[in-house]
Amino acid sequence: MHPKYALLKALVDRETTHVAPGLRQKLEEMPAAIANWITDPFSFLDHLDTSWLHGVNKKLHQIGLSSSPMRAFARSTLWLSIKPRQILPFETVLAFPMGNILQHPVNTVIEGYKRLGLYDLALDARRIVQTDILQAIAASLSEDQKAFYKSIQHMPTPIDFGRLSLERWDKQPSTLQTVIEKRGFNRFAKALYPCHPSLKWYLQHLLNKDKAAMFNSLCTDVKNKNAQHTLQEEVKFAFKGLL
């Protein structure tokens, strides 16, 4: 063997004695986020709202949810077709501040941001003196909403997004619930403004396309550090017990 090839072989053999153990490292010895990503790098597809899928992608999604031998190929192809180039792995984003929101069903996320709308309701209710309106508000809330409302009713918040105009409310529970959801979604979107772009991308794709577009338009800077911090604390408190 030529000396230079012998030297190269010796170097390769020497290095592989150090590399091989690392390659054989068991998944359970790795950080959970890395191990989960290696096991299934396309796990977010289980959470993806189907409004993002069309034609071939919808068929790929159906195969990806099955036990078909084509499952891995379908998930890989679908994932590469929808994800932006710079997106971080889903498992990594779950470990970010606020990231745990992403690992729960979309109905739980909706319930969480609807709770946030009760902060707006509490602010407006302090300005109302008409007993009939206050009674109608109480009658329109679910038991969970009543309990949460009671816990934050007198809690100060440094940011006010304006009146709900409850004096002109028709006293229909469905009307109030719609307002609460819209206001809560606004707080939710603004609270997540400082979050990593990957987290916001995953959240938007957890929601349907219309909700995602609304989130994108509402996710703006409140330009007040104290208010921004409080909004994030409100999100954490609203989701507590749901997550």
Residue ranges and their predicted role:
Residues 1-243:
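General marker for long, soluble alpha-helical cores
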